[in-house]
């Protein structure tokens, strides 16, 4: 793969992912967690969590469940807040 340009993830910036990321950020700040603390609790890297909040990652349902668990939030409530 030498010499090949790095491709952006196909879903990066999708409005649904951006809305979900914003809902995660709001929930995180509401409970007073830093991005790093949420990442530790959800068992992901801090830079990955930053990408989640910017809508750069297409999350698996298990990742959403782990993040919601760390936020003490229901996935359905977070999705509803995101308008999804």
Roles of regions detected by a PLM:
Residues 1-26, 30-31, 36, 69, ...:
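N-terminal flexible/basic segments that precede or flank functional cores
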Residues 21, 47-50, 83:
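Glycine-centered small-residue hotspots that permit tight backbone geometry or close packing
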Residues 24, 35, 46, 61-64:
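Helix-turn-helix DNA-binding elements, focusing on the entry/boundary residues of the two helices
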Residues 32-51:
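Short alpha-helical DNA-recognition segment
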Residues 60-77:
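DNA major-groove recognition helix of helix-turn-helix/homeodomain DNA-binding modules
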Residues 77-84:
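Short amphipathic recognition helices of helix-turn-helix/homeodomain-type DNA-binding modules
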């Amino acid at each position: 793969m030498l010499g090949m340009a790095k491709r952006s993830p196909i879903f990066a910036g999708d409005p649904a992912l951006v809305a979900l990321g914003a809902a995660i950020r709001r929930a995180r700040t509401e409970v007073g967690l830093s991005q790093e603390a949420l990442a530790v609790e959800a068992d992901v890297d801090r830079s990955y969590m930053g990408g989640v909040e910017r809508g750069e990652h297409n999350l698996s349902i298990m990742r959403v469940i782990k993040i919601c668990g760390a936020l003490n939030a229901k996935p359905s409530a977070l999705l509803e807040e995101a308008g999804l």
